A protein has these predicted regions:
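Conserved catalytic-core motifs of GNAT/GCN5-like acyltransferases
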Residues: 142-147, 305-317
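Secretory-pathway/luminal and periplasmic proteins that interact with or process carbohydrate-rich
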Residues: 199, 299, 307-309
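A short, structural micro-pattern
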Residues: 52, 72, 109, 142-144, ...
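A local structural micro-motif
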Residues: 113-114, 181-183, 205, 285, ...
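Residue-level preference for alpha-helix termini and adjacent loops
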Residues: 27, 32-33, 78, 159, ...
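Acyl-donor binding region in acyl/amide transferases
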Residues: 64-137, 246-304
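A conserved beta-strand-loop-helix scaffold within acyl/acetyltransferase catalytic domains
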Residues: 2-65, 119-262
Length: 317
């Protein structure tokens, strides 16, 4: 049995080509998305001998001594690449050995590590057991997080609304005459985005807006994102950016005009994005985080299923 090792790669084409084979891979693992965040990016392959068995995308701070999650990135790595048909007992063991190696390697290389895991990466034992028998040694901590995922198998436009909370159905009917469109000006979208946070007494600085712009432009220009809006006679009332990969669509950004919050536009736009994902043949819609009360409740009202994931944190002593 060959030991596991890390090898850095700059071949983004090969990297992206491998992503569909990993259950943990998402659009947030793609080189295009990670470049758009503007972070210092390093891409690693995990080798067993000469075979690539996993991928590990990392983003570092300017010092190169800390691994920090990029902005607007709920999940990252590791990304397992199992052989098709691998028995479950071998898959569990392979993932454990991978986690064990990465826990030790990252703790040695970096002063601090913050790593958000996919909700499909379920075995965090190797990280939690790092230095298990070493009294006083540094340990990994894990923070539970939740997202909400709507399976699209068997879903259709006729029956889905009945599954959604009654108030959302009412808002959809209220907004039935409003105009849905994809010809959104990014400046208009960013204006609404800033207003959405201002209404909650939250500031969005210029750096954050610049990052949202880069991601939005990359997604729309690269064909892996949809910037859509819903307008009233008074103008753009709500806008969303859904990004997508080979399997699912992700509700990444949402923005609404505070003066038109009661128009039902935001709700109608969510329905439209769900049906768009269905028409594209995608498997799921990920609502990307239900980790605050009001926003989480809005997303859960569309009948997705809760999914638990973890963010790992390690600080070297």
């Amino acid at each position: 049995v060959y030991p596991l090792s890390l090898r850095e790669t700059t071949d983004t084409a090969a990297w992206d080509a491998r992503l569909p084979a990993s259950p943990q891979a998402t659009v947030f693992s793609s080189s295009a998305f990670l470049r758009a965040t503007g972070c210092r990016l390093r891409l690693f392959e995990v080798l067993r001998g000469q075979q690539v068995v996993a991928l590990l995308p990392l983003t570092e701070d300017d010092s190169g001594q800390r691994v920090l999650p990029p902005p607007y990135t709920p999940y990252l790595g590791p990304l397992c690449l199992h052989e098709p048909g691998l028995p479950n007992r071998e898959r569990v063991l392979d993932e454990f050995l991978l986690g064990e190696m990465l826990a030790a390697e990252l703790a040695t290389r970096y002063r601090e590590v913050r790593l958000p895991l996919s909700w499909q990466y379920t075995d965090v034992r190797p990280f939690l057991w790092h230095n298990y028998h070493a009294a006083g040694a540094s340990r990994y901590a894990s923070s539970p997080r939740y997202t909400a995922v709507l399976p699209l198998a068997g879903l259709d436009a006729e029956t889905y609304p009945a599954r959604v909370r009654a108030c959302r159905r009412q808002e959809r009917r209220k907004a039935a005459a409003l105009r849905l469109h994809d010809d959104i000006d990014i400046d208009d979208f960013l204006r609404l985005y800033a207003l959405t946070f201002e209404r909650q007494d939250l500031a969005v600085d210029a750096g954050q807006l610049a990052c949202v712009r880069r991601i939005t432009e990359a997604a729309v220009g690269g064909g892996w994102g949809r910037l859509a809006g819903c307008s009233t006679p008074q103008g753009l009332a709500s806008a969303t950016l859904f990004v997508r990969d080979h399997a699912r669509a992700y509700y990444l950004f949402g923005a609404s005009d505070p003066a038109q919050r009661n128009s039902g536009a935001a709700t109608r736009l969510i329905f439209d994005n769900v049906f768009d994902a269905l028409n594209r043949g995608l498997l799921e819609v990920d609502f990307v985080g239900v980790n605050s009360p009001a926003r989480g409740d809005f997303k859960l009202s569309f009948d997705p299923q809760l999914r638990l994931y973890f963010e790992l944190h390690h600080v070297a002593y």
